[in-house]
């Protein structure tokens, strides 16, 4: 089984903020597959099982995401872990993939690295840098950013659909990496 995790913060206060890119992309994927999440108190997360995948949205707040991930990983004895997360070091509209490595200062990844190791797949979605990191990642996208954000999230969702069918991270990486922001026609 593969554990596919979207990172974000719970509560309406953080809904659709830059830091919740992982939640939003997973929500879109689950909706398109005509599935739904159910809350698991055991893992303090919303879960959805599909084929040999477990979709997980930790409800621990970002800095403690590793607790939910470790709990689900151990309970389901998953072989692979893929984390979908925002990346402020990437421009908005860029989607990249990584296997292992550092956390880039992302607190959700720090928590996962500490409790689980740093050997997992990542789908990184650019949110661009702003003035004041905390304020920026916890802010909503500006109206003029919405078309590019929506296109990037759709691209990331399509990459995940490909991965679910292929079970091939390298093929997904080769096919769906966007080194430059998507071009949006107005």
Swiss-Prot record:
Q: A Pfam family name for this chain?
A: Pept_tRNA_hydro
Task: Name a GO CC annotation attached to this entry.
Answer: cytoplasm
List site positions: Discriminates between blocked and unblocked aminoacyl-tRNA.
9
Q: Which family does it belong to?
A: Belongs to the PTH family.
Which HAMAP family did the record assign?
A: Pept_tRNA_hydro_bact
Known catalysed reaction(s)?
A: an N-acyl-L-alpha-aminoacyl-tRNA + H2O = an N-acyl-L-amino acid + a tRNA + H(+)
Where this protein primarily resides, as one coarse class?
Answer: cytoplasm
Active site residues of this protein: 19 (proton acceptor)
Identify the keywords attached in UniProt to this record, alphabetized: Cytoplasm, Hydrolase, RNA-binding, tRNA-binding
Asked if the Swiss-Prot or TrEMBL record annotates the protein with the keyword Nucleotidyltransferase, the reply is no
Q: Which InterPro entries match?
A: Pept_tRNA_hydro, Pept_tRNA_hydro_CS, Pept_tRNA_hydro_sf
Q: Where is this site: Stabilizes the basic form of H active site to accept a proton?
A: 86
Q: Which domain of life is it from?
A: Bacteria
List this protein's GO terms for biological process: protein quality control for misfolded or incompletely synthesized proteins; rescue of stalled ribosome
Q: What does this protein do?
A: Hydrolyzes ribosome-free peptidyl-tRNAs (with 1 or more amino acids incorporated), which drop off the ribosome during protein synthesis, or as a result of ribosome stalling. Catalyzes the release of premature peptidyl moieties from peptidyl-tRNA molecules trapped in stalled 50S ribosomal subunits, and thus maintains levels of free tRNAs and 50S ribosomes.
Subunit structure, as described in the record:
Monomer.
Q: What EC identifiers does the entry list?
A: 3.1.1.29
Where is the protein localized?
Cytoplasm
Please give the CDD domains that the UniProt record associates with this protein: PTH
- Positions annotated to bind tRNA: 14, 61, 63, 107
Q: What is this protein called?
A: Peptidyl-tRNA hydrolase
GO MF term set = peptidyl-tRNA hydrolase activity; tRNA binding
């Amino acid at each position: 089984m593969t554990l596919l995790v979207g990172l974000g913060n719970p509560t309406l206060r953080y809904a659709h903020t830059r830091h919740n890119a992982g939640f939003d992309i997973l929500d879109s994927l689950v909706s398109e597959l005509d599935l739904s999440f159910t809350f698991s108190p055991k893992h303090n997360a919303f879960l959805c099982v599909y084929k040999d995948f477990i979709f997980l949205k930790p409800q621990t707040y970002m800095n403690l995401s590793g607790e939910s991930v470790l709990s689900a990983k151990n309970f389901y004895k998953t072989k692979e872990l893929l984390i979908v997360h925002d990346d402020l070091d990437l421009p908005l509209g860029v989607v990249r993939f990584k296997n292992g490595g550092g956390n880039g200062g992302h607190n959700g990844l720090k928590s996962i690295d500490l409790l689980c190791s740093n050997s997992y797949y990542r789908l990184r979605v650019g949110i661009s840098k702003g003035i004041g990191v905390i304020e920026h990642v916890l802010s909503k996208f500006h109206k003029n950013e919405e078309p590019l954000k929506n296109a990037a999230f759709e691209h990331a969702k399509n990459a995940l659909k490909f991965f679910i069918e292929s079970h091939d991270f390298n093929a997904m990486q080769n096919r769906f990496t966007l080194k430059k922001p998507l071009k949006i026609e107005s």
